[in-house]
Each structure stands twice: as structure tokens, then as C-alpha cells.
Amino acid sequence: MWLDSSLQTWGPLVEVAEKQGQMLAIENVFEETPDTLLLLLSSFESPYFRFCFDTGHHNVFGKVPLSVWLEALAKYLAEVHLHDNHGEADEHLPVGEGKFDFTQFFALLSERKLSPIYTIEPHEEEHLWRGLEAVRKYLR
């Protein structure tokens, strides 16, 4: 039932994206595992329908290791939303100021030779500058 509804919702959007040469990326929000997103993405197998991994959402809601997520969805990864939290709420803290393991995350991306678009998601201006500084050390 969920998949049928999702296919009906996303199908027309994917068609438009393909015609216009624009990419759509679906983000993990409340998903505990990558299974539902993998099912949806693999149903289309479109180069214009991809995955956006949100580090903060994974830290709050993810129930399987980061490596499992990236193993399952690496071929679909187009973008990453970078922010941190303490695992209890979607705090949108700067990278490295919560409990998400960014060292492991960037190592996994490097091992798989993945180079997604990175978006820093601060909710305060000061967090932007601290976040940029923190991310620089991982992208050198």
C-alpha cells in the first residue's frame, strides 16, 4: 500500500524531472532503516530520482548503522544535508557539536568514492560559520 501510494505520488514528478533534466532527491526523515527508500528508488531506477542523506535525521531516527545505509543507497546518493544533534531531537547543530560520527561518515564516502553535493543546514548564523569550519577538515 505504501509503495503504491508513493509510486503514484512520485511517478509524475520523476517524469517531469526526466523531461527537464532536473534531479529530484528524496531525503531520509523518520526512516529507521534504508529499506523503504531503497524500495522506492529501485522501483524507478531513474538517474533523475536520487537520495539525499540527512545526517541529523539519521542520528535521531536511524536504527541501523550508518554503513548499512550507505551500502544500501550509495548508488542513489546525490546530496548530503550536514548537521548534528545529540540523538534525541533534530537540533541542527554545527558538524561535530553533537553525537553523529562525521569521521566515520566521510571515511565511508571516501571508501566508496562518493562525492555528493553537500548542504550545511544551520538554524542560526553563528552555526553556519562553525559548521563551515568543521566541514573543511573533512573535505581536504
Regions found by a protein language model. Name each.
Residues K19, P34-F53, H58-R140:
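Histidine-acidic metal/acid-base catalytic patches
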Residues M1-R50:
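Active-site acidic/histidine proton-transfer and metal-coordination neighborhood
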